[in-house]
């Protein structure tokens, strides 16, 4: 069992990764032709959303493509309902969770499923993302394949639980905006940090070859790449963003008389850390509550400022009745025409126009008792 275990772990994922280099990647910019349903030789399609991508759908797609039936699958990145309807399986988009039709979205207001709710007896109560849903429904089969054993093998049960608790749950929690800490106890494990990945390059206790030289070279390559990537980010993205945030703060009263709404000239820039630092330096009378900006598609976003830099709790979330709604349903409840969505946790929403995004922020401000002062505020 030991050799078969290691052979399954070390060879099958690598083979799948190498094969993936030669597969097509569908996109909104280059839309795929609709797959003829009667063409049994056509490769399967995995649908997910286009635009900014996140760890959960990347992991969901990667897990699926490790399975034989999806090994040659085409990834179709779109939000077009007709194109998604032509896909064999859809993850993280579509507003539907239906394993019978292979639809695995978690953004809809009605979705509250956890590993515990769908697998009675499991202890984990973190809301599932698309990664967790795919892992829940396909994980045992995938692990059995990678381990070179059957799904009935007790090893699969053990590894299934271990991989969820120490890998997938973290992805679920982060994507759903769930804080790791509550009452001093961690809700889920964080095991994919750079230090942890370097540590895992060391030989395991039961590997015949305990030489660390090759692993150390790989570790150097790993940390060098991440160091240079981070340096490049700070130099070319993070630092220039400070000037944009500083200018936005200076112009905030031209955006709204409350002074609580900031408009970024360029969307997508890393603004949060700069905002906290600048608030500390400038000591505005009230806290900045919302940031509005355009996304990659040219639509407008209204994002709530978190209470703290790494918190998932907002200073003022968008109204509860709006959360998890989209399009006309959201228009009706909010009274603001042209809405696109509000996230289920209320930390972000979308609108087709700048004025609409502003109105979403203003309507939220109007519903709270009083502005939120900063602890170090001084009168301006």
Curated annotation (Swiss-Prot):
A molecular function GO annotation? 3'-5'-RNA exonuclease activity
Q: InterPro entries in the record, alphabetically?
A: MYG1_exonuclease
Q: Where is it expressed, tissue-wise?
A: Ubiquitously expressed, with highest levels in testis.
* Residues recorded with modification N6-acetyllysine: 266, 272
Q: Which GO terms describe its biological process?
A: locomotory exploration behavior; mitochondrial RNA metabolic process; mRNA processing; rRNA processing
Mutant lacking the gene: phenotype: Mutants are vital, fertile and display no gross abnormalities. They show an inconsistent pattern of altered anxiety-like behavior. Mutant males are significantly less anxious than their wild-type littermates, females show increased anxiety in the locomotor activity arena.
Which locations, inside or outside the cell, does it occupy? Nucleus, Nucleoplasm; Mitochondrion matrix; Nucleus, Nucleolus
As recorded in UniProt, its EC number(s) are 3.1.-.-
> Record's Gene Ontology CC terms?
mitochondrial matrix; mitochondrion; nucleolus; nucleoplasm; nucleus
The transmembrane residues are none
Membership in a protein family = Belongs to the MYG1 family.
The record's listing under PANTHER family reads: METAL DEPENDENT HYDROLASE - RELATED (PTHR11215), MYG1 EXONUCLEASE (PTHR11215:SF1)
| UniProt protein name | MYG1 exonuclease
Its source organism is Mus musculus (Mouse)
From which lineage does this chain's organism come?
Eukaryota, Metazoa, Chordata, Craniata, Vertebrata
Q: Which gene encodes it?
A: Myg1
